[in-house]
């Protein structure tokens, strides 16, 4: 085993928190190994004035780290799983998926009001088409405003742009120690989360058995299965950041359950499907639920969304 391992991370406060957390877990299990964190900015970190849907999604928050891995400048990289494309560059693999935190979306409102308590025509900040579509389906009166930037920036915009509320991933808020600011975790019946939301993943080289073996110690089997089902569904639907697809999978009574949604951008139509399978059939479950969505009208919705890009 190498005695010094170089770990890649984006340089945002949340990304660094997640990377340090992974390193801490590995240090407990491997006290003789030294870990060094190296940070870099990704394309998604630099292009803050453009909506995610307009930039495209392939490796927006991962590519620079992946290039560094392939060039052997770093040994592995820590990501939010929801930022990882469903198809990874040749030679790279997800070496571990850690135990998932709350996968839901959280509402932070200026006066602590819940979603149902917000006034008619409330201005809500979010840049996710998935959130926009589902929220408009629930409350067509909402005025949705684009919201980019890191977590600190987004929190400031709640006040500076006089928004009634902003929607962020609950896990990120909690990791930053801001859970007291959450007015409500939005129920899945209202808004299903992004694929992989709430889970931290570690990407490494496929041909690096030492690192792969090291990462086994932080893998969480149930989270891995659940997120594999979600990513399989997304891969089948060929969806990325710019497509309104939500999904959530979990293990219940030794069965893997998956619920997913496809929506029109304006929220006028939301198609929901679910399925279950054995825990070791995650990929099959994802495809099965994706096929249900397509048959129920999801195919037409996705074609229309892509035609309008």
UniProtKB/Swiss-Prot annotation:
GO MF, one example: hydroxymethylbilane synthase activity
Extent of the signal sequence: none
Any GO BP: protoporphyrinogen IX biosynthetic process
Note on cofactor: Binds 1 dipyrromethane group covalently.
PROSITE patterns: PORPHOBILINOGEN_DEAM
Biological or metabolic pathway of the protein: Porphyrin-containing compound metabolism; protoporphyrin-IX biosynthesis; coproporphyrinogen-III from 5-aminolevulinate: step 2/4
The protein's Enzyme Commission number: 2.5.1.61
Catalytic activity: 4 porphobilinogen + H2O = hydroxymethylbilane + 4 NH4(+)
Cofactor: dipyrromethane
EC primary class: transferase
Cross-referenced CDD domains: PBP2_EcHMBS_like
Chain segments annotated as coiled-coil in the UniProt record: none
Highest taxon in the source lineage: Bacteria
Modified residues (S-(dipyrrolylmethanemethyl)cysteine): 241
Pfam families cross-referenced by the UniProt entry: Porphobil_deam, Porphobil_deamC
One Gene Ontology cellular component: cytoplasm
Keywords of the record: Porphyrin biosynthesis, Transferase
Miscellaneous notes: The porphobilinogen subunits are added to the dipyrromethane group.
Family annotation (NCBIfam families): hemC
SUBUNIT field: Monomer.
HAMAP family: Porphobil_deam
Family: Belongs to the HMBS family.
Role of this protein: Tetrapolymerization of the monopyrrole PBG into the hydroxymethylbilane pre-uroporphyrinogen in several discrete steps.
Protein name: Porphobilinogen deaminase
Source organism: Desulforamulus reducens (strain ATCC BAA-1160 / DSM 100696 / MI-1) (Desulfotomaculum reducens)
Designated gene of the protein: hemC
């Amino acid at each position: 085993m190498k005695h010094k391992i170089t770990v890649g991370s984006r340089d945002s406060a949340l990304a660094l928190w997640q990377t340090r957390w992974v390193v801490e877990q590995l240090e407990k299990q491997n006290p003789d190994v030294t870990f060094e964190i190296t940070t870099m900015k990704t394309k998604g970190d630099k292009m803050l004035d453009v909506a995610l849907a307009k930039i495209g999604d392939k490796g927006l928050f991962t590519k620079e780290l992946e290039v560094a891995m392939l060039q052997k400048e770093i040994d592995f990289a820590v990501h939010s799983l929801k930022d990882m494309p469903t198809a990874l560059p040749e030679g790279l693999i997800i070496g571990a998926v850690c135990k998932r935190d709350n996968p839901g979306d959280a509402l932070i409102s200026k006066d602590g009001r819940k979603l149902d308590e917000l006034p008619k025509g409330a201005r809500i900040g979010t840049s996710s088409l998935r959130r926009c579509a589902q929220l408009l389906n629930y409350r067509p009166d909402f005025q949705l405003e684009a919201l980019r930037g890191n977590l600190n920036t987004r929190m400031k915009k709640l006040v500076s742009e006089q928004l009634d509320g902003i929607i962020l991933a609950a896990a990120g808020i909690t990791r930053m120690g801001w859970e007291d600011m959450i007015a409500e975790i939005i129920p899945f019946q209202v808004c299903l989360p992004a694929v992989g939301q709430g889970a931290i993943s570690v990407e490494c080289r496929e041909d690096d058995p030492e690192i792969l073996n090291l990462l086994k110690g932080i893998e969480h089997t149930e989270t891995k299965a659940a997120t594999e089902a979600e990513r399989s569904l997304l891969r089948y639907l060929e969806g990325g950041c710019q497509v309104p697809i939500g999904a959530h999978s979990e293990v219940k009574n030794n069965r893997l359950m998956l619920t997913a949604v496809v929506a029109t951008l304006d929220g006028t139509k939301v198609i929901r499907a679910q399925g279950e399978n054995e825990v070791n059939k995650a990929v099959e479950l994802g495809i099965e639920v994706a096929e249900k969505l397509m048959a129920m009208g999801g195919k037409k919705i996705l074609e229309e969304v892509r035609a309008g890009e």
